[in-house]
Amino acid sequence: MSVCEVKARKGLIRVKVVIDEDRIANVSITGDFIVLPEDSVFEAESRLIGVRATESEVRAALASALSGASMTGVTVDDFVDAVMCAVRGEKG
């Protein structure tokens, strides 16, 4: 499991990810960011499972999951950066 933390404009995004055969097998997104409804984060995690661990596929899954969410001080790009940082095994 790789973990990465990314500082967004207003919050910290922490991602834990497990990669199996170039696909996301498990992912956890936590932190002190504001995304409403809160279920949007769970939806993002669900949509990432099974996705190929490439920036384009991660971006598509997150953009779809978070499209209806209200985000304060964080963006889809911030979430993509955090997931890809964890995928690469960086610390942030």
Sequence positions of predicted segments:
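Generic structural signal for short, solvent-exposed loop/turn connectors between secondary structure elements
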Residues: 1-2, 21-22, 54-57, 69
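Structured beta-strand/loop patches that form or line metal/cofactor-binding pockets in enzymes
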Residues: 1-23
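A hydrophobic, small-residue-rich beta->alpha segment in the mid-to-C-terminal subdomain
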Residues: 24-62
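Generic hydrophobic/packing signal
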Residues: 9-12, 62, 76
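Solvent-exposed, flexible loop/coil residues
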Residues: 10, 37-39, 78
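C-terminal structural segments of small proteins and small subunits
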Residues: 64-92
